[in-house]
Amino acid sequence: MADSIQPEKHIHFIGMGGIGMSALALILAERGHSVSGSDRKLTPAMQALETKALAIFESQVSKNFAHLQSRGIEEPLVVVSTAIPSTNPELIEAQRLDLTIWHRSDLLAWLIEQQPSIAVAGSHGKTTTSTVLTTLLATVGEDPTAVIGGVVPCYGSNGHKGNGRLLVAEADESDGSLVKFKASLGIITNLELDHTDHYRNLDDLIETMKTFGRGCKRLLINHDDPILKEHFQADACWSVHHVETADYAALPVQLDGDRTIADYFEQGQKVGQITLPLPGLHNLSNVVAALAACRMEGVPLEALLLAVTELRSPGRRFDFRGEWQDRQVVDDYAHHPSEVQATLTMAQLMVQSGRSPLPRTPQRLLAVFQPHRYSRTQEFLNAFAQALVSADALVLAPIYGAGEQPIEGINSELLARSIRLIDPNQPVFVASTMEELAGLVKQHSQPDDLILAMGAGDVNSLWERLSQEGIGGEASCSPAIAA
């Protein structure tokens, strides 16, 4: 496959608006390829490509290829993602025209093979770890190429064509296609059953990740994860709990709502101290993974420890959106019980410690959660309830189906009942529509609240609904703050 894309080849992305597809399109465009793409609606990621793409279509219809032909593009390479169904009219037309069709993972695998590469996999923390890794490398002058599932603050984009020797890629495990990646260094952050629409059980996930690991020249794993520790052999490991058994480790000295201070160890010896402007033990683990990868690539330690002090989270990872009626609104991508628990724990640390990277220290936590997929909600119903009960108050949005058909009886009201079984006194409110959601937040929030919107769907529109629809007060927007 390494020689399959010639410089003059035009590449057309069906579903260009997705975070992973747009990153690939951006990099290919910056490498000089002619690109085009389509999606059902114009997304911010597509808007960023408007000046770089030959054509962008706000519909996925067969006539898009006729338009390309009118522009002199006869045989484009067509790229699709798992999200594109076999019934998609544009895909059907590409098949009728007998065009070459690649899955998104084929294109990413090709990019990974073109230069020394680091692929970041795992159930949780992939985006943050790959963003931190990219940022550290950029800060010390390495300028990596990056294909990330979130916006990297130092580049302001999810895709970047660097001039350095390394490529950093986020390796999504959701459909198992990461087994195609042959990276110079693979990282696995943790393993926990998710994406039950693809994986039958945990053993199925473990075998897929083992195949990914075997395909990498070197493998770096999280020694604190019990599944990785038991089932995987690796070239190196990291920990935020143990020094003696890890090649790279950080032991927390101070955990506050606005920062983390930890002693940093390599091969059992303390070699420095980390001052991290990101709260939460899970963020410390992500940063140590990135540090370990940099060190395995020969980056000097002193420059890295200095770079750590300037880190910021990727977009939609505890992303401060602004203030509304003396309430601070934060957006987070958490959509699995473990992610929800880690995010709520970090938010409560800000409330309880009186220290926060936000403009003002919040006094109470109002969580707004949008379950993602009916199958995931059904599979992890009790785990979601156990995680969400730690909020001071809770508003639930309708389930975001992400293309799934509804499952009878599986809805946000069922989740609310499960939460009330754990704590009958928990204030929990259920919105029947997204339009109703902002009204419930207005009704049940209070000044000095941290309004934390969590989910992988469109719950991130809550800020716009609060600030633009003028329901009850003025709103002000501030730059995203790392957390």
UniProtKB/Swiss-Prot annotation:
Binding residues annotated for ATP, in chain numbering: 122-128
GO terms for cellular component: cytoplasm
UniProt-listed Pfam families: Mur_ligase (PF01225), Mur_ligase_C (PF02875), Mur_ligase_M (PF08245)
Family matches, as Gene3D superfamilies: Mur ligase, C-terminal domain, Mur-like, catalytic domain, NAD(P)-binding Rossmann-like Domain
SUPFAM superfamilies: MurCD N-terminal domain, MurD-like peptide ligases, catalytic domain, MurD-like peptide ligases, peptide-binding domain
Any single biological process term in GO: cell division
Protein name (Swiss-Prot/TrEMBL): UDP-N-acetylmuramate--L-alanine ligase
